[in-house]
Amino acid sequence: MKRTIPVIGMACSACSANIEKKLNSLNGITSASVSLPSRSALVDFNPDEVSLTDMKAAINAIGYDLVIEEGRSAVEIEKRAYTLLKRKAILSWIFAIGVMAISMHWINFGNNNTSNQVALLVALGNMLYCGKQFYVSAWKQLKNGLANMDTLVALSTLIAFLFSVFNTFWGEAVWSSRGIVWHTYFDASVMIITFVLTGKLLEEKAKDGTASSIREMMGMTPKTAHIVDGDKVEEVPISTIEVGDLLEVRTGEKVPVDGEVVWAESFMTPNAAYIDESMITGEPNPAKKEKGDRVLAGTIPNQGKLRMRARQIGKDTMLAQIIRMVQEAQGSKAPVQRIVDKAALVFVPVVSTIALVTFLAWWIIGGNAYLPQAILSAIAVLVIACPCAMGLATPTALMVGIGKAAEEQILIKDASALENLRKINALVTDKTGTLTIPNKNIDFTKSDNLALEERETLKPNAREAMETLQKNGVEVYMMSGDKEEAAKYWAEKAGIKHYQSKVLPQDKENLVRRLQTEGKHVAMVGDGINDTQALALADVSIAIGKGTDVAMDVAQITLMGDDLRTLPEALQLSRRTVRMIWENLFWAFIYNIVCIPLAAGVLYLFDIDWQITPSWASALMAFSSVSVVLNSLRLKLMK
């Protein structure tokens, strides 16, 4: 059984890695994949061995939460959390301005000791209210032998605060008596929390954009429907509709569920209505619907009205299945992400070790006079290290890429399919139903090219799609059960050089296998049961949405419409998405590789008197996460 479960409380990639590790350790769970940007866990489990309650208890123990209750809305929880985060960020800035005013002597309390004590109270208030979640999370992580970004924030702010408290009450006696100049660093502890909260606020806002495609699809389902009861038509909540109910859909209204037309009329046609299905199929022209035709939830009659019998409701509608498929794809992981997750698990311990080494190096080399510098350098290292940027690099790009594909009526089942599609350099395609549309009225007595045209029609834009693929370095192979004459004719019409005639289902599979042995990365496009063997064997399998359910079940990618130009679009989107992933990872790693030494004070080795302070470190850390998300969102703007 597969289920996507909302997760509450994740802050960085170490969080998602810890949750994933915990879930995978439970008996009865076949696999679990946790996505930071989608805030969800995709879990494949045996309900007889492990329950959702068991999972929730295990995740609660390490400081997070799963939303499994029916009446509990993850969206509402996230909205409340965002509002609270916003309030804390604003209040933290007020605390920060106050502490900065005291430390810069803009506010004078008569003597330094009083000023330090006031700053202590302000910083303590900021930590207890605005920064409370960091310390609670860090403590829960510590109890379970884990660590995440909250651990770094909690550790760095506590060190800065406690060292400042020590200096406030004992600085004169301990340091001044030894001729050492001392300071308090309450401003550092406050500014770290302030910048981290601000960064998280901006990050949440930016991440919200990565999920816009799913929200738009969810918005396609109406909240109410018109049910026909005898001579009465009344408006009812969509949740009350049952299979078999008779519904009425008027011009401009959304079809509430999947069903079968029992009556239709329009101004142009007495016994038919015209429905806009572009949001599902991508077809720009309205589809004519008569008695007995199928209608889909979320589509809109733009000419006429109809009555329909409900056949699939709730989670069984085509729209609900599409949404579920996209959510699962966005929650799945590309192979490169699994490497990043392993790095995230050791990232915080490694950074903590670097911070300790930094502290000891400054203290041993400089002695007690450099103890404040040693502490500040260690704090800066703890703060500037950012596992978030690495953790967000892959999933945010995948979420945007898969969401954009869905907007183009390209449904991608998992992240590996999107990643593998960019490598494709050979495409095997079925003919009938994939490249051509069979005509209903066929005259089998004719044998010339005119007869071929009468039997089936090349899909609009099929030739353009095949030529675009070949220009992009993809060799196209057409497989047909037709005789040589017909296969050659349609291959030429579609602009395809390689073709085979009189093929059986195993011949398609054999061609895919042969191309793979030649070192090619092969995609297979088909629409029928006779294509499933080849689809299953191909590196990337692509089904036509109007084909059989069997083909769509086997395929990793489904094209919902008949416009084959979505094939090269999918290839282009795959290449852009993977390029974006590597861009994000490159800058995330470069950020940590460059900034951690600068925070430690490495430039002093070259007689350059400069390093990144804890306050600036927190600002840079926040910016690094936001920049990764914003960079991924550029995919939405690419044509």
Q: What does each model-identified segment do?
A:
Residues 54, 58-76, 119, 123-224, ...:
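Actuator/coupling domain of P-type ATPases
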Residues 90-98, 338-366, 378-386, 391-396, ...:
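Bilayer-spanning, highly hydrophobic alpha-helical transmembrane segments
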Residues 4, 27-49, 53, 183-186, ...:
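Conserved cytosolic catalytic loops of P-type ATPases
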Residues 280, 376, 386-451, 534, ...:
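Conserved catalytic phosphorylation-site environment of P-type ATPases
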Residues 17, 38, 267, 412, ...:
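Conserved ATP-binding TGD loop and adjacent catalytic N/P-domain core of P-type ATPases
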Residues 139-144, 205-220, 396-415, 632-639:
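Juxtamembrane helix-loop transition segments at the membrane interface in multi-pass membrane proteins
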Residues 108-111, 143, 162, 404, ...:
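Membrane-embedded alpha-helical bundles of multi-pass transporters
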Residues 1-116, 216, 232, 268, ...:
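Flexible metal-binding regulatory segments at protein termini and peripheral loops
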